Amino acid sequence: MELDPVTLAVVQNGLQQVCNEMDLAFVRAAFSPVISEALDRSDGIYHRDTGELIAQGELGLPVFVGTMQFSTQAVIARAAKAKPGDVYIVNDPYLGGTHLMDVKFVKPFFYRGRLFAWLANTGHWPDIGGMVPGGFSANATEVEQECLRLPPVRLYKEGVLDEEILSIILSNIRIADQRIGDIKPQAAAPTIGEKSLTALL
């Protein structure tokens, strides 16, 4: 299929705008200053089957957009029965992560009843457990000492937050009452992206 330059530019900018809207929704609602002020986050759109990057916004950190590709691929490998409204959480550095405090949310995007793409974001959480606040310790000798490590797990099931999984996460991190102020905006951002991408298509 061939695209003329004008159509290509319209599609490219439309997809970029979807990512920007996700990013702005996340940063405006996030509780943590490291996300809302230091802007340590990013959003992207990924291929339905391969998990490869399709589009990224102008506002987030480019390094996250690249590593989210591998996290999205890890989700795809484990999410054979993804449904609308599902949101997966992952921070495992061995599955395409950076460090453990960079938590990824990955959501399947359905269009006309079929899986069409994946929407993903990364946010740096101030703490996700481990032997010291913030996760960085010169005395750590293994990854288990650094932070709680999450393989791809479905945190939202068909739009409903799994309170049991949430309680496991919050029970293993400091200032847990503040993290819900990042979790909900981070999960809501791809929902904003869904609406924008549907309108674009």
What is each model feature region?
Residues 1-11, 149-201:
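N-terminal leader/propeptide and maturation segments of large enzyme subunits in energy/redox metabolism
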Residues 14-38, 76-80, 89-96:
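Short, basic/aromatic recognition patches
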Residues 37-41, 101-103:
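Short, small/polar residue-rich loop motifs at catalytic or cofactor-binding pockets
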Residues 43-44, 107:
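Generic short beta-strand
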Residues 48-56, 69-92:
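Regulatory sensory and allosteric helical modules in signal-transduction proteins
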Residues 61-74, 126-135:
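A short, polar/charged loop-to-alpha-helix boundary motif
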Residues 102-112, 120:
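A short, hydrophobic, proline-anchored segment that marks a local hinge/packing element in signaling
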Residues 115-172:
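Gly/Pro-rich active-site capping loops and adjacent beta-alpha segments
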